[in-house]
Amino acid sequence: MPFMPSMPADALVKDVYSLDPQTFRYWLHVEEAIMRGASAFTAGERELMAAYVSRLNSCTYCASSHSEAAIVLGVERQLLEALIADIDTAPIDKRFKPIFKFLKKLTLTPSKMIQGDADAIYAEGWDERALHDVIMVC
């Protein structure tokens, strides 16, 4: 629901963006750079991260679009559900577990982020650029 009188109650993101096509055009370039540009993460991994954050935010539209994109890009369909249920038992490379814990905390309780959250990512061999990319996807 867009809460805008000119929009129907079932407006989609594209409908809201149509109010300001110029800004939307710039946003598309930013989004393309974040989701498809150079990164330590594949496009599928970034789509999985975005789907995960969207599920935590209860954004059905974004969760659906990002999870479908992740699947098209080779991510197993059940992986998102496994991550939502329990990061520790999800069937994902252990290097990704602190990344999804970081995303969860940043999404649900951002004021509680501490250096240790980033350090857990670094401890798995990721660098500052990887952390930056995780934050940008979020």
Predicted regions and their residues:
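Hydrophobic alpha-helical segments
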Residues: 1-138
